[in-house]
Design a protein with these regions (language model features):
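ATP-binding glycine-rich loop module of kinase domains
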Residues: 13-53
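Conserved activation segment of eukaryotic-like protein kinases, specifically the C-terminal portion
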Residues: 157-170
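Conserved HRD-motif arginine in the catalytic loop of eukaryotic-like protein kinases
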Residues: 223
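Activation segment signature within eukaryotic-like protein kinase domains
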Residues: 105-106
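Conserved short submotifs of the Hanks-type protein kinase catalytic core
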Residues: 73-87, 91
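Conserved HxN/HPN-centered segment at the entrance to the catalytic loop
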Residues: 59-68
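Catalytic-loop of the protein kinase fold
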Residues: 117-133
Length: 234
């Protein structure tokens, strides 16, 4: 796909509505089709686009839809679904989740991750800011900029990616990230939704305590080994 043609077509068919994020590594804009009035997100980031290209052919109700991917010389442009709703982070600004609400969100994320992990995709950045709840109450996992494909022949990750507090120890060069890396983040997420704090500061003391503790074990071998196992415990 020609870069000039791609950008010219976008400019001709879409108008800029708002900018959601803009820094040296990532720009995220909301565009609106000039004729149809439909909104979509244009994401520009420094990366290969390898995972987004796989997502383009993957449809799941709990994963943001990816429409098109263009790879430039040192960046990737992703056109994806615009989700009208709130992030879990925005919901937490108004109050904590009840146990059932937190379980429902994690169940939905496990459904999404089961499909992703089957394809070898590890998200590596599950956190409240990357989980949307749309107007119909549907949970959507977004932002795959830090995601990677699991490669069995590798001993560690090529690049250190993720968010401090939610990233598992192996994301910092100790081993290769795998499905258990995302399970670690789910444990932290549950604790934050229920207490407002990282488990190292305030560990949830209710019925989900043992589940959270198992998710966030430093040793991946002591965590749940799959999201299916986690769902069964929930």
């Amino acid at each position: 796909m020609d870069e000039g043609w791609f950008n010219a077509t976008l400019d001709e068919q879409y108008e800029l509505i708002k900018t959601l994020k803009s820094n040296d590594d990532t720009q995220i804009h909301v565009l609106r089709h000039r004729t149809l009035g439909r909104d979509m997100v244009k994401r520009v980031y420094k990366g290969t686009g390898e995972v987004y290209k796989l997502l383009r052919s993957l449809a799941h109700p709990n994963i943001v839809n990816v429409y098109e991917v263009f790879t430039g010389s040192d960046y990737t442009v992703v056109l994806e679904e615009y989700i009208n709703g709130q992030t879990v982070a925005e919901v937490l600004e108004t109050g904590l989740y009840h146990t059932r609400g937190a379980i429902n969100i994690v169940h939905a994320l496990c459904d999404a991750l089961e499909i992703l992990h089957t394809k070898g995709i590890i998200h590596r950045d599950i956190k409240p800011e990357n989980i949307m709840i749309d107007e119909a109450g549907m949970v959507k996992l977004i932002d795959f900029d830090a995601a990677k494909l699991y490669k069995s022949y590798k001993s560690d990750d090529t690049r250190i990616m993720g968010t401090a507090g939610y990233a598992a120890p192996e994301q910092f060069g100790l081993a290769q990230s795998d499905e258990r890396t995302d399970i670690f983040a789910l444990g932290v997420l549950m604790n934050v939704m229920l207490t407002g704090s990282h488990p190292s500061k305030k560990l949830y003391s209710g019925k989900l305590k043992s589940i959270i503790e198992k998710c966030i074990q430093t040793n991946p071998g002591k965590r749940y080994q799959s999201v299916t196992q986690l769902q069964e415990s929930l």
